[in-house]
């Protein structure tokens, strides 16, 4: 990850590539590079850091003359952000250069195979196996080499390929990662999204999974995975540049909400091999562990609260969830029998780093769950699992939260099997439920087209209460946070059973109460709380399954969620609450992507 561009035509390629990469900056990245064809060689330049540094290094592209080239911005997934790990990558013989957006799931076995055949690896990336496979399979027929290489890859990839034997040609390949061709006059472009294209052309061809394209300045031929020609229509791009960056969505937050099914799938898929869970290179030693402490801030903390139930239920180990800003000052009862789980999207959250260091100084082993490769927390940890959520631009997290939660679910099942605290029958049921989360998330989006209308009803509220029990309460915490941080409406969450211990005094005529009722085992109890607040004039917006007819009859309004195992329900329940907060904020004219007084990464105490 995170974006690729390519050009072949009459212009100098490097300035076009640099400009295209700048248009992809919004996606987030930690390094960048370009490769330009120069007669019988490929010139490559890459840097760690900003595209401005790459432009400076190449004198805005002037130092890399040539009319055919490829470019890349990287968000590290395999290997730290370094010049060596940055793309493009070159083959040992210098004949090929490749840029890649995605994740190659079987790269370790391919890497070992290629090393055994004498190929030398310069980087730690999964991408480098691609360029060596191309070299291995190339026998003078570039199309065949591309097809044979693609057939060996498992995972997601959008590729741009240069070969010195055909200096005006680029091959572009798509599998589960977006790739769009831009059609000009005597020139052709490609990019991960239209943002990088609209300054040059409005004519686009969208590749589908399993397709690849052979590109020259005057010629575009698209093939299916068997090498058979495919006819594709040219689509006229009507978006402006800003809209293109947002994928046609009005806000980044909405885009990221809608991306969650695919983001969670990207988190899950590489970690599930058949019916086994493989947590990257994190062979977590649970010997002697008698307590698990989860520490984080903000939404990451609430992800820990939601996952606590699954970990305790399956692993039979007590789990404490602690705010990092409190844990660091609390003289915690932590020692070598404690596993510390540290959650942070950025991996740079100041309070979380400080709490982590304090616990490690007392003997705890630390498992980090972060999104940014090479971040401080990932380096401090004994083990690290990356969420692979991709860049999240909106300040209010959505897919960052759900991918953290997904990794915690993976850990719960992984640890339970390792500790032998789960029988094979339940393990099978929960594995099926885990794999179903992306589909259920999409269903939760599809089931609630009327959330915008609900927002029109509730957006003038001065305060909102969110209630639930067990995992529903954990979701209520995050739902209330989403509402307050982007709509600026005072929103608080309460354990439903605690209402009568004080909070019910605040209920008045017309007071909005969002009641989560997604756990059948405790739905009756939550329903009694709904009756209590309704008796005092509250307007109840219930979150429940369509099959729960009694709640339908009690609530003033409904948000529906599909049925899923209650241990994993939080990842599905939260999605419509994110949408509710989004639409309420939109009704109130708030700056949704950049709420006032908030920052994406809190790197100070």
Residue spans of the language-model regions?
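Conserved short alpha-helical segments that host acidic/polar catalytic motifs at enzyme active sites
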Residues: 1-246, 250-251, 262-290, 302, ...
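Generic C-terminus detector
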Residues: 539, 552-554, 564-605
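Acidic/histidine-rich
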Residues: 156-187, 454, 459-485, 520-522, ...
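Active-site phosphate/pyrophosphate-binding segments
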Residues: 260-264, 268-293, 383-512, 585-605
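Glycine-rich phosphate-binding loops that contact phosphosugars or nucleotide phosphates
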Residues: 287-428, 432-436, 516-559, 580, ...
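Glycine-rich oxoanion-binding loops at beta->alpha junctions
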Residues: 67, 71-84, 270-283, 307-343, ...
């Amino acid at each position: 990850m995170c974006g690729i561009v390519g050009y072949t035509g009459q212009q100098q390629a490097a300035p076009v590539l640099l400009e295209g990469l700048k248009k992809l900056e919004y996606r987030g990245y930690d390094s960048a590079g370009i490769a330009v064809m120069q007669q019988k060689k490929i010139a490559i330049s890459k840097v760690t850091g900003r595209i401005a540094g790459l432009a400076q290094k190449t004198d805005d592209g002037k130092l890399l003359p040539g009319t055919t080239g490829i470019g890349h911005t990287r968000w590290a997934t395999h290997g730290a952000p370094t010049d060596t790990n940055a793309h493009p990558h070159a083959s040992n013989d210098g004949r090929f250069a490749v840029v890649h957006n995605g994740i190659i799931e079987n790269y370790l076995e391919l890497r070992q195979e290629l090393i055994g055949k004498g190929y030398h690896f310069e980087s730690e990336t999964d991408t480098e196996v691609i360029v060596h496979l191309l070299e291995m399979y190339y026998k003078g027929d570039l199309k065949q080499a591309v097809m044979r290489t693609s057939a060996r890859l498992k995972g997601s990839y959008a590729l741009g390929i240069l070969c010195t034997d055909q200096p005006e040609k680029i091959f572009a390949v798509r599998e589960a990662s977006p790739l769009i061709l831009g059609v000009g006059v005597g020139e052709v472009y490609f990019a991960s999204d239209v943002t990088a294209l609209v300054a040059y052309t409005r004519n686009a061809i969208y590749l589908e999974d399993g397709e690849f394209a052979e590109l020259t300045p005057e010629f575009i031929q698209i093939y299916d995975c068997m090498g058979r020609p495919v006819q594709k229509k040219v689509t006229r791009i009507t978006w402006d540049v800003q809209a293109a960056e947002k994928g046609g969505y009005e806000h980044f937050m909405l885009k990221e909400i809608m991306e969650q099914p695919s983001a969670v799938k990207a988190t899950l898929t590489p970690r599930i091999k058949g019916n086994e869970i493989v947590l990257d290179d994190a062979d977590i030693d649970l010997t002697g562990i008698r307590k698990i402490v989860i520490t984080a801030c903000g939404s990451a903390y609430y992800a820990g609260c939601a996952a606590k139930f699954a970990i305790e239920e399956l692993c039979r180990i007590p789990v404490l969830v602690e705010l990092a800003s409190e844990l660091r000052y609390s003289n915690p009862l932590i020692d070598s029998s404690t596993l510390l789980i540290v959650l942070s999207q950025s991996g740079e959250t100041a309070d979380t780093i400080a709490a982590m260091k304090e616990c490690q100084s007392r003997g705890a082993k630390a498992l980090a769950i972060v999104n940014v490769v090479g971040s401080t927390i990932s380096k401090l940890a004994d083990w690290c699992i990356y969420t692979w959520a991709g860049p999240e631009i909106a300040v209010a997290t959505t897919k960052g939260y759900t991918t953290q939660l997904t990794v915690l679910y993976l850990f719960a099942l992984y640890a339970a099997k390792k500790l032998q605290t789960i029988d094979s029958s339940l393990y099978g049921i929960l594995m099926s439920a885990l794999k179903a989360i992306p589909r259920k998330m999409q269903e939760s989006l599809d089931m609630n087209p009327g959330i915008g209308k609900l927002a029109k009803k509730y957006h003038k509220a001065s305060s909102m209460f969110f209630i639930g029990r067990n995992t529903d309460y954990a979701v209520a915490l995050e739902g209330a946070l989403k509402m307050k941080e982007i709509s600026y409406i005072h929103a608080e969450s309460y354990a439903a059973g605690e209402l009568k211990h004080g909070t019910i005094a605040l209920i008045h005529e017309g007071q909005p109460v969002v009641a989560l009722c997604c756990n059948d085992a405790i739905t009756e109890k939550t329903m009694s709380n709904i009756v209590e607040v309704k008796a005092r004039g509250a307007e109840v917006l219930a979150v429940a399954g369509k099959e729960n007819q009694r709640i339908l009859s009690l609530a003033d309004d409904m948000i529906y969620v599909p049925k899923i195992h209650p241990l994993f329900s939080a990842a599905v329940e939260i999605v419509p609450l994110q949408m509710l907060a989004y639409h309420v904020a939109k009704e109130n004219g708030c700056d949704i992507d950049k709420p006032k007084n908030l920052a994406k990464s809190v790197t100070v105490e």
